[in-house]
Amino acid sequence: MPREDRATWKSNYFLKIIQLLNDYPKCFIVGADNVGSKQMQTIRLSLRGKAIVLMGKNTMMRKAIRGHLENNPALEKLLPHIRGNVGFVFTKEDLPEVRDMLLANKVPAAARAGAIAPCEVTVPAQNTGLGPEKTSFFQALGITTKISRGTIEILSDVQLIRPGDKVGASEATLLNMLNISPFSYGLIIQQVYDNGSVYSPEVLDITEDALHKRFLEGVRNIASVCLQIGYPTLASIPHSIINGYKRVLRVAVETDYSFPMADKVKAFLADPSRFAVAAAPSVAAAPAAVRLVPLLSRPRRSPRSLMRTWLRPVRLK
């Protein structure tokens, strides 16, 4: 009878994980080291309506996924990441939002002897409130102290544990005596699965503004290269047209060739003061004119020299 119950439980588990993989296009592979049952229950409650947490043996999860590859071959990308104490968090919501909910459910924890430190632990300079009889304990750890008003005072910040170090018994005892809980434990996102793609959780930190900025930088670089080599692209053509138009204006200024815009430029060169006065009340309506005002106001340069500066072709950096 117990064997049948076990077999039934396995069958139901396989059906459940396959159902979740079919229903949810996105999930996290999360590490659950040092997460207790009470904390796991709290996490499940906080994610209710937003996500579903599924834990289990790695062999069972791999077997269920392999049996479902015919229907969804993209799931094979998950198999290399199912190792260690891991589980799944399935969701249809915004991934950064669910990630933030998982981070909010981390709980502080005391250092235990033999544990691997996930982060650096620094003991700040402070009056410990401990009696002088503990001085030898601090000396054994290489911590400089003095006796102040009958208690031990740590004189400077001390890096006690580095990331990846194994916590020793002395370090754990000291942190407990000082009521310092240096670590925090919770479900740690190791990989993200999103509609057939698997990527690291750092990608979730990339915002739309950052993508927009990178895209504009790329467009600017392409336009700059294409302008230099004379190869037309969508990014460089507007600048090429502007540069060509400026060259035509420069030719018209130097010769008798005339067209409406060239006539205006020649009129400005003939009487720069008239242009400066006319441009003042119509700044918003004449952006090109605004560009000429500071140039015309500089001393020791002729109007023709100023116009040549303005007509110089644009070169992107």
Swiss-Prot record:
GO CC terms: cytosolic large ribosomal subunit
Coiled coil residues, start to end: none
A GO term, aspect molecular function: structural constituent of ribosome
Keyword line: Phosphoprotein, Ribonucleoprotein, Ribosomal protein
InterPro entries: Ribosomal_protein_uL10 (IPR050323), Ribosomal_uL10 (IPR001790), Ribosomal_uL10-like_insert (IPR040637), Ribosomal_uL10-like_insert_sf (IPR043164), Ribosomal_uL10-like_sf (IPR043141), uL10_eukaryotes (IPR030670)
Quaternary structure and partners: P0 forms a pentameric complex by interaction with dimers of P1 and P2.
Protein function: Ribosomal protein P0 is the functional equivalent of E.coli protein L10.
Name assigned to this protein: Large ribosomal subunit protein uL10
Natural source organism: Ictalurus punctatus
Originating gene: rplp0
